[in-house]
Amino acid sequence: MQNINEIEELIKLISKLPGLGPKSAKRIVLKLINNRDELVKPMANTLAQVYKNVIRCQSCGTLKSNSLGCNNCENSKEKYNKICVVEDIADQWSIENSNIYKGYFHILGGTISSAGQRKEDLLINSLVERVSRENIEEVILATSATVEGQTTAYYIEDSLKKTSTKVTKLAQGLPVGGEIESLDDGTLYSAFKNRTGIKTNSD
């Protein structure tokens, strides 16, 4: 293939996306080039709008329009007494699509890890503030069954010790190393239904 700088750069960028390597990236780039008017123009416009207008809510971590309030927390149409804590937005979407949980979400933005992700980088302090401010009765820890996910869950539990809120975690049985977004609806349903208490509001 003749080296064209713009194409090579696009292949490099696309190959950075989750689950995509150089071969898959090349196929995607060829598809885009062969469908410029149908795909490239509208995609470029949409990406520009997303870059300009979509941000993370500083309180709960979900995505929101920078010109509107957050529908997950401040402008929610429903009032709940539960918060489900997840690592990232993909986990929130998976749980929402399964229709097994009705309540607020709190997106941490990652996990505490040895790779340099610190607890200060995550939205843990804002979670504690939400729990107190919104009179939350239960916090459900839905972090992944990885060392990093469990370490993060333990830290959150410790951070909530001074509150009267019940803290639960998804039931055991999640595959070790499994990430929430990769679980099927049946596994998620069982994990939520059989969740176990870590800290009760009588502690």
UniProtKB/Swiss-Prot annotation:
Superkingdom of origin organism: Bacteria
Matches recorded under PANTHER family: RECOMBINATION PROTEIN RECR
NCBIfam families: recR
Source organism of this protein record: Pelagibacter ubique (strain HTCC1062)
GO biological process: DNA recombination; DNA repair
An MF annotation (GO) of this entry: zinc ion binding
Gene: recR
Zinc fingers typed C4-type, residue spans: 57-73
Pfam families: RecR_C, RecR_HhH, Toprim_4
Name of the protein: Recombination protein RecR
Similarity comment: family membership: Belongs to the RecR family.
Function statement: May play a role in DNA repair. It seems to be involved in an RecBC-independent recombinational process of DNA repair. It may act with RecF and RecO.
